[in-house]
Amino acid sequence: MSDESHEPFKRLFFALNCAPEQRRAIAQWRGALQLRSGRPVPAENFHLTLKFLGAVGVAQIADICTAAAKVRVPGVALRVMLDRVDVWRRHGVLVLASEQAPPELLRLVYALEQAMLPFGFEDSPKEFRPHLTLMRDYRLPVPESATPPEFILRAEHFTLFESHKGCYRALAEWPLIL
């Protein structure tokens, strides 16, 4: 048995982080929905996933960061309108979604997917759907809201996060504007 089988792993993903004021506003809006199903995602965990990597060997992280640093970025801050509430029944989640993803965001996701191919992370088999998860284990219809969602997620960098026991920790970040 090789030492490789004992290599520690981290659960990683690339995402756009939410600013504290965005988190507060979204959490307040979610609270007004008075939801009676599911588990709320803690506001400090709000983000928009770009590319989920899953379990990654610790020894690969530096190379992944080097590859991410070479990703061609939009050159402008990203603005993603989160203007739709949706229930993804298969996953049991309530999400804030974007009616239309900005082309710059789609190009960034594609560039990240291409940069991760040499590490064995394949292109996502599904179409990228920008979203922010509000609730997990959600089993009801889309809730009615007195105020429609109109949140603009603004990002000037993208981040590599580690997920550990429900807590997300930023490991590295790269600017979108050079």
Locations of the language-model features?
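Histidine-dependent nucleotide/RNA phosphoesterase domain, centered on the 2H-phosphoesterase fold
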Residues: 1-178
